[in-house]
Amino acid sequence: MSDILKKIELYKREEIAAAKAAVSLADLKAMQAGQSAPRGFYKALVAQRDAGNFGLIAEIKKASPSKGLIRPDFDPPALAKAYEAGGAACLSVLTDTPSFQGAPEFLTTARDACALPALRKDFMFETYQVHEARAWGADCILLIMASLTDDEAERLQDEAFSLGMDVLVEVHDAEEMERALKLSSPLIGINNRNLRTFEVSLTVSETLASMVPADRLLIGESGIFTHADCKRLQAVDISTFLVGESLMRKDDVTAATRALLFGEAAIAAE
């Protein structure tokens, strides 16, 4: 595990302990009962793929450790509606506060504002967090293989499945990919960002894509800024993408989403 992930795990463990003291598992389960059923994160992405379209997981992200504040004018419900209008298939919402200035209410309010399934984007270490995610309305959780053992990943995955949620398993190298493929989740995300150096390269996705069998849905993450980037990854059978920063920096998020998915020329021709 990188030094960055070790530091994150330290504060997450403290956060989880404090959360458990404040909100019991029974309370979380009661909150889950008041939520609408999971909307089908994987199903929404497969529908786009099967229709021959690019599938977009559009990210609602206020800030990041490497870039600092990304969007000062930050309105999660408005952003969710803008992404939906632009053709996104799903949302990804940051709930981690120390590193990303995220919050649980960003997830809840964004999901409530639209019909899209939503991913809780956070660093998951304990099954309690999975129950938090469902209580807040999440339809999917993220598992970062670089921060988890195989047993931990499987335990978190199975807990999410028991709640009707989907699981996005994130990898950055061949060893993590081999480990991810031992899990049963069909959603595999390739993070093009090195979490040790923050360097980003689409060649990471291009290199690892060939390891993945056809029964998994590959998602390209990080470093995707243009329709040309999407086309480049399509050449290695990646047609689903998680994109945040490049869209968050645009004034017209709906137009930027459409341009990413369909290309500037297609938008201009409408």
Curated annotation (Swiss-Prot):
It catalyses: 1-(2-carboxyphenylamino)-1-deoxy-D-ribulose 5-phosphate + H(+) = (1S,2R)-1-C-(indol-3-yl)glycerol 3-phosphate + CO2 + H2O. Keywords: Amino-acid biosynthesis, Aromatic amino acid biosynthesis, Decarboxylase, Lyase, Tryptophan biosynthesis. Signal peptide: none annotated. Pfam families: IGPS. Its EC number is 4.1.1.48. Pathway: Amino-acid biosynthesis; L-tryptophan biosynthesis; L-tryptophan from chorismate: step 4/5. InterPro entries: Aldolase_TIM, Indole-3-glycerol_P_synth, Indole-3-glycerol_P_synth_dom, Indole-3-GlycerolPSynthase_CS, RibuloseP-bd_barrel. One of its GO terms (biological process) is L-tryptophan biosynthetic process. GO terms for molecular function: indole-3-glycerol-phosphate synthase activity; phosphoribosylanthranilate isomerase activity. PANTHER family: INDOLE-3-GLYCEROL-PHOSPHATE SYNTHASE, TRYPTOPHAN BIOSYNTHESIS PROTEIN. Belongs to the TrpC family. This is Indole-3-glycerol phosphate synthase. It comes from Rhizobium leguminosarum bv. trifolii (strain WSM2304). The gene is trpC.
